[in-house]
């Protein structure tokens, strides 16, 4: 009906205005020019997910020798998961990333190196490591992932001053 179409258009206009407002209100950052392709407009949390009581099954630090077995079990029980990966540019890694994506699971960045002292030495070092992992995921799967998990957790003992700046920058990026 015309009423439903008008309502849908109004909702779309409101969403677009909200997105534009969010982008315009993002604080300027000294890191804004580094990897501008790593920006997302997705919310960090979802009330919708909380209301449904959804549980997320995640795997860190892969892909590994267990990836294909894990995928088989997940398929057997019709369960989807998220894999936070530490990828490399080997054919074996690319094949596992492709298998994860083809099975309908989510892939997120964990780290390219997983070497905390290097990753957390500066915001730029973190972004370099992050982008390397992000780029490998994209090259292997065509997916521009919008999710990540900090190596060592977002609260860790590695360079807390830099960690706080990294959290601020990654929050700014969406």
Give the ranges of each region predicted by the language model.
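His/Asp/Glu-enriched short active-site or ligand-binding loop at hydrolase and phosphoryl-transfer sites
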Residues: 163-174
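Short flexible/disordered coil segments
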Residues: 149-151, 173-174
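Active-site beta->alpha N-cap acidic-glycine motif
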Residues: 27-150
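Intrinsic disorder/low-complexity detector
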Residues: 12-20, 35, 39, 43, ...
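Active-site glycine- and acidic-residue-rich loops that bind
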Residues: 155-161
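Non-catalytic interaction surface on structured domains
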Residues: 75-77, 160, 167
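Intrinsically disordered, low-complexity serine/threonine-rich repeat tracts
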Residues: 1-29
């Amino acid at each position: 009906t015309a009423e439903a179409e008008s309502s849908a258009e109004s909702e779309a206009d409101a969403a677009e205005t909200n997105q534009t407002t969010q982008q315009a209100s993002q604080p300027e950052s000294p890191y804004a020019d580094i990897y501008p392709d790593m920006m997302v407009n997705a919310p960090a949390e979802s009330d919708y997910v909380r209301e449904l009581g959804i549980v997320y099954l995640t795997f860190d630090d892969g892909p590994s020798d267990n990836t294909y077995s894990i995928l088989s079990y997940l398929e057997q029980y019709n369960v989807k998961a998220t894999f936070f990966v530490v990828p490399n540019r080997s054919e074996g890694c690319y094949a596992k990333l492709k298998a994860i994506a083809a099975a309908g699971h989510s892939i997120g960045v964990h780290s390219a190196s997983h070497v905390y002292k290097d990753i957390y030495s500066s915001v730029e070092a973190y972004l370099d490591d992050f982008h390397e992992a992000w780029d490998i995921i994209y090259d292997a799967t065509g997916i521009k992932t919008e999710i990540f998990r900090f190596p060592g957790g977002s609260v860790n003992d590695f360079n807390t001053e830099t960690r706080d700046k990294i959290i601020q920058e990654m929050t700014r990026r969406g």
